[in-house]
C-alpha cells in the first residue's frame, strides 16, 4: 500500500481513542448522519496511556475546586448511561474518603466544592475514622470527608467499553495505526498515518502525552508527565474489599496518595503521587520505577496503612499531558477544523464522558455549554504570556495536584 494512498474519507476523525477519544467517538456515533473514524496507535485497551492501571477515582466533590462540579455530575450521569447501554459495571459506588490533618488545603478546597455544589457528604473526626476505617493510620487532629457520590472506575474496561459502544453505533476505529502528522487544507484536514492518508472535515486530537508530537504549536502550553502507580498486599485482604473499604485520598506528613479497594482479591492500590516527574518522550522515557522509588513508595504506604506487607507487588508508570495550572484544554482551533483535548494533568478520567461530549459538540457545532472559559486556548495562551511577563491574571486558578 502506498503511503500516500487515501484510505478513508470521513466527517470527523478522532486521533487517540483512549480516555477522551473513546468517549468522543461514543458521543459522535450517537449523532445521525456523521461518518466517524477513530485512529489509535495501539490496540483497543492497552497499558501505554494515562488511563491504564486498573482503576481511577471518581470524585463529585473535587479538591481542585467547584470549577469541576458541573462536569463531574454530568460525567456521573453519563457513566450510568454507558453502563446501561453496555451492561458493564464501570463505576464502583464506594464513595471517596479524603483523610488529612484538619485545615489541610485539599480538605478545605474539597469542603468548598461540597458547599458550593450542595453535594452529599459526611464529615468524620479522628475517633470516627479509627472506628469505621481501622485500615488507616489516623493521627489526632485528622479528619475525613466522605464524598458520597464518589467511587472508583475500571479504567481499561471503561475505555474498551466506550470504544465498543461507538463501533456498535457505526463508528470505525483503526488500531495499531500511528498518526504521523496533521495538515489543514482548503477542503478539510489531511491526516497522515502509517497506513495511508485520512481525509476529514474535522479532527479531534486526544493523544495525551503525545499531544505536542501531533500539534507542535501547543508546546508552550502542554507538557508530558509520568504518573506512578503501586499496589501492595494486605495482611488481611478482607479488610480492603469494596464493601468495607472505600476509594480514598490520604495526606500525611507532607505526602499524598490515593487508592481503591482490592479488585483482584489479593492486592490493593496505594499510589503515592507526591512526586510526579516530567518526561520528554513518552515512547522511550523510563517505563518502570527504580528500586529507590519503590522503597520511597513503600515507606509512604506503610506509614499510611500499617496492615500491609512492606513491599510493592505491582507497579507501573503512565504518561499523561499537563498544563501549567493543571486546567485542561478543551477547545477548537481558529479554523474550526481541529478540536483539542489535552492537559488533563491526572485529573481527567473521571470526567471523560462529559469531556468527550464537549469535544464531540465542538466538532459538530463549534460550541459546548460545558466548555468552561478556563478550558479555552485563549485562557492558556494568556496565562503563558502572563508567566513570561511575571504577571498574575485575575482568573488565575490555584494549582492543585489531581488524579
Language model regions located:
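C-terminal catalytic lobe of FAD-dependent flavoproteins
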Residues: 299-403
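Active-site substrate-recognition segment that forms the wall
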Residues: 26-30, 89-91, 197, 202, ...
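Short beta-strand to alpha-helix junction loop
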Residues: 70, 98-107, 145-165, 285-293
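Dinucleotide-binding Rossmann-like beta1-alpha1 core, especially the glycine-rich loop
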Residues: 55-132
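Beta1/beta-strand and adjacent pyrophosphate-binding region of the FAD-binding site
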Residues: 5-20
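Helical element adjacent to the flavin cofactor pocket in flavoenzyme catalytic cores
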Residues: 146-202, 206
Amino acid at each position: 500500500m502506498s503511503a500516500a494512498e487515501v484510505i478513508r474519507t470521513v466527517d470527523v476523525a478522532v486521533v487517540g481513542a483512549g480516555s477522551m477519544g473513546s468517549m468522543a467517538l461514543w458521543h459522535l456515533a450517537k449523532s445521525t448522519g456523521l461518518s466517524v473514524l477513530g485512529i489509535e496507535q495501539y490496540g483497543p485497551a492497552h497499558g501505554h496511556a494515562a488511563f491504564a492501571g486498573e482503576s481511577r477515582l471518581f470524585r463529585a466533590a473535587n479538591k481542585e475546586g467547584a470549577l469541576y462540579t458541573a462536569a463531574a455530575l454530568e460525567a456521573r450521569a453519563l457513566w450510568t448511561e454507558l453502563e446501561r447501554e453496555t451492561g458493564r459495571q464501570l463505576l464502583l459506588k464506594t464513595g471517596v474518603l479524603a483523610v488529612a490533618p484538619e485545615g489541610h488545603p485539599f480538605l478545605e478546597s474539597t469542603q468548598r466544592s461540597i458547599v458550593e455544589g450542595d453535594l452529599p457528604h459526611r464529615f468524620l473526626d479522628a475517633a470516627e475514622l479509627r472506628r469505621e476505617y481501622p485500615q488507616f493510620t489516623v493521627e489526632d487532629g485528622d479528619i475525613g470527608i466522605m464524598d458520597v457520590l464518589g467511587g472508583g472506575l475500571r479504567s481499561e474496561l471503561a475505555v474498551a467499553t466506550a470504544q465498543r459502544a461507538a463501533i456498535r453505533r457505526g463508528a470505525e476505529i483503526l488500531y495499531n495505526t500511528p498518526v504521523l502528522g496533521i495538515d489543514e487544507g482548503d477542503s478539510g484536514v489531511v491526516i497522515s498515518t502509517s497506513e495511508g492518508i485520512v481525509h476529514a472535515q474535522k479532527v479531534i486530537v486526544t493523544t495525551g502525552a503525545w499531544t505536542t508530537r501531533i500539534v507542535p504549536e501547543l508546546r508552550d502550553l502542554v507538557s508530558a508527565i509520568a504518573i506512578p502507580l503501586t499496589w501492595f498486599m494486605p495482611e488481611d485482604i478482607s479488610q480492603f474489599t469494596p464493601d468495607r473499604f472505600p476509594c480514598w485520598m490520604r495526606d500525611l506528613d507532607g505526602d499524598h496518595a490515593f487508592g481503591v479497594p482490592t479488585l483482584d482479591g489479593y492486592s490493593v492500590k496505594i499510589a503515592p503521587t507526591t512526586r510526579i516527574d516530567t518526561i520528554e518522550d513518552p515512547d522511550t522515557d523510563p517505563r518502570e520505577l527504580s528500586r529507590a522509588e519503590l522503597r520511597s513508595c513503600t515507606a509512604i504506604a506503610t506509614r499510611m496503612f500499617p496492615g500491609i506487607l512492606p513491599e510493592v507487588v505491582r507497579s507501573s508508570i503512565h504518561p499523561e499531558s499537563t498544563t501549567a495550572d493543571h486546567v485542561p484544554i478543551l477547545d477548537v482551533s481558529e479554523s474550526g477544523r481541529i478540536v483539542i483535548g489535552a492537559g488533563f494533568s491526572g485529573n481527567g478520567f473521571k470526567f471523560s464522558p462529559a469531556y468527550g461530549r464537549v469535544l464531540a459538540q465542538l466538532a459538530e457545532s463549534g460550541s459546548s455549554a460545558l466548555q468552561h472559559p478556563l478550558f479555552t486556548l485563549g485562557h492558556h495562551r494568556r496565562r503563558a504570556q502572563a508567566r513570561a511577563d511575571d504577571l498574575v491574571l485575575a482568573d488565575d486558578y490555584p494549582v492543585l495536584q489531581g488524579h
